[in-house]
């Protein structure tokens, strides 16, 4: 086996092995590069940025970190900033708000949608040294030593480092290796993926070419019974769309349905006559498709993110519905906060070039990192979980709230989104961006109450009304 972490005894620098050339993994690579920490990225695919039909939303909290890293200009050149949000209901009613424009004014960054492939290409191409990224390097095991770890790959190579970061997605190998280590070391509770990740919805996502009646900067959400469509009209009129479908039952992680191209076509054809916007049908958008894919949507947040010299970030630790556009942004934040934690552990010590944190030092640091991230992630997970069910009119309460409350909230939607954005991570070891807005301070919830009580109060009120209605109905039926 070829040892590509060779002569580590002579290598004085602390080294991080990042597994996964994902948005989280490549963002972390940029963060480490800026701070001067050595790293290598291992990616199992042959290429970093394949075209899979996926789009990605960059909210101001993700955009701020990318701006600090000098990467947001690439994003901005590829997007049309969102300016208007439109809600469409099955009874023909429509409502409109300028909350995307308000968010940009408050935070200094637009709501941006672009091809996921474009973002990955930018993250990769702008690395100072792309030779640190190794493709065709699928990880099969992580071995532990007293002061380091060794990562073994299918191409018969091994990579040594002092910290392994799993940024390898929902089907994470590093997560399994972390739990294997936790079990053998009796450190923490080994979590069951099947109990932590559930699947209630599927999604067909795709990109379509321009339609003359759809204007760049539109965000359109179509509410329907048991399904919904979220779409964004981007640069040059290209439409990024997500068709969400409630499944016939809830599945566990290991029961996840497998979908084919034919499944996606059948579902889209079945709903093609439904209104998309104004006189445009979903079929009009679907007929202009460039790429599309169907996938189950996992939902869940893991409790244990680290063990010893292993930590996991991004989709390997949390997965939630795309409806609020925070998935990639949370991955970017994870990378930023992990880099902050590493920067603090190095800055807090009298050190020379040979300083390397001990395993207990790293474990304590990673526990603090996890504690800081998990509370924020859980809050956003709850909002996303509510959003997908609200838009798919999942039950009477969701139907009434979506139709008779959401269109009349005015600036409340922008205020809620602002509170979700304002407490996003910022890189502590780099200057804050010059472009900014007052929203970061105004809407910070670090010393305030969260949005959740208000939302729950609305739902509780609806529940009370429904109970009263049910009682009155039963009374009149009996009389």
UniProtKB/Swiss-Prot annotation:
Glycans are attached at residues 156, 198. It is a single-pass membrane protein. It holds the Pfam family FAD_binding_3. It is an enzyme of class 1 (oxidoreductase). The keyword Transmembrane applies. Its main location: membrane. Its cofactor is FAD. Its EC number is 1.-.-.-. One of its GO terms (biological process) is terpenoid biosynthetic process. It is found in: Membrane. This is FAD-dependent monooxygenase cdmI. It comes from Talaromyces verruculosus (Penicillium verruculosum). The lineage of its organism: Eukaryota, Fungi, Dikarya, Ascomycota, Pezizomycotina.
């Amino acid at each position: 086996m070829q040892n590509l972490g060779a002569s580590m005894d002579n290598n004085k620098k602390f080294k991080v092995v990042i597994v996964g050339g994902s948005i989280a993994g490549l963002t972390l690579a940029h963060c480490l590069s800026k701070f001067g920490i050595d790293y290598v990225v291992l990616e199992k695919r042959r290429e970093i940025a394949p075209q899979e039909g996926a789009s990605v939303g960059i909210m101001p909290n993700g955009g701020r970190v990318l701006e600090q890293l000098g990467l947001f200009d690439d994003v901005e050149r590829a997007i049309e900033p969102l300016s208007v949000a439109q809600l469409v209901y099955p009874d023909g009613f429509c409502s409109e708000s300028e909350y995307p424009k308000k968010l940009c004014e408050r935070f200094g960054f637009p709501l941006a949608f672009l091809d996921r492939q474009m973002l990955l290409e930018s993250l990769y191409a702008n690395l100072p040294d792309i030779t640190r990224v190794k493709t065709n390097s699928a990880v099969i095991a992580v071995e532990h030593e007293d002061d380091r770890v060794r990562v073994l790959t299918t191409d018969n190579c091994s990579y040594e480092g002092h910290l392994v970061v799993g940024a390898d997605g929902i089907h994470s190998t590093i997560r399994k290796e972390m739990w294997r280590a936790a079990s053998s070391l009796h450190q923490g509770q080994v979590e069951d993926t099947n109990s932590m990740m559930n699947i209630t919805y599927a999604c067909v996502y795709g990109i379509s070419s321009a339609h003359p009646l759809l204007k760049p900067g539109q965000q359109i959400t179509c509410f329907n019974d048991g399904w919904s469509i979220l779409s964004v009209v981007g640069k040059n009129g290209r439409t990024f769309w997500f068709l969400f479908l409630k499944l016939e039952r809830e599945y566990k992680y290991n029961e996840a349905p497998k979908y084919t191209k034919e499944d996606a076509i059948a579902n889209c054809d079945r709903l093609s006559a439904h209104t998309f916007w104004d006189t445009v049908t979903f079929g009009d958008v679907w007929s202009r498709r460039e790429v599309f894919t169907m996938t189950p949507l996992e939902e869940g947040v893991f409790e244990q993110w680290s063990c010893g010299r292993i930590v996991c970030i991004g989709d390997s630790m949390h997965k939630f519905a795309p409806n609020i556009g925070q998935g990639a942004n949370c991955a970017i934040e994870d990378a930023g906060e992990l880099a902050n934690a590493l920067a603090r552990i190095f800055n807090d010590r009298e050190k020379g070039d040979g300083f390397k944190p001990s395993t207990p030092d790293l474990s304590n640091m990673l526990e603090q990192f996890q504690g800081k991230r998990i509370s924020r992630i859980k809050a956003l997970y709850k909002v996303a979980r509510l959003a997908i069910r609200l838009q798919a009119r999942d039950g009477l309460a969701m139907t009434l709230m979506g139709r008779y409350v959401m269109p009349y909230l005015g600036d409340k939607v922008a205020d809620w989104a602002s509170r979700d954005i304002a407490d996003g991570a910022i890189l502590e070891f780099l200057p804050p961006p010059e472009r900014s807005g007052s929203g970061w301070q105004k809407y910070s919830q670090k010393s305030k109450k969260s949005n959740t009580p208000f939302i729950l109060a609305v739902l509780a009120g609806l529940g009370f009304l429904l109970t009263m209605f049910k009682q009155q109905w039963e009374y009149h039926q009996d009389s």
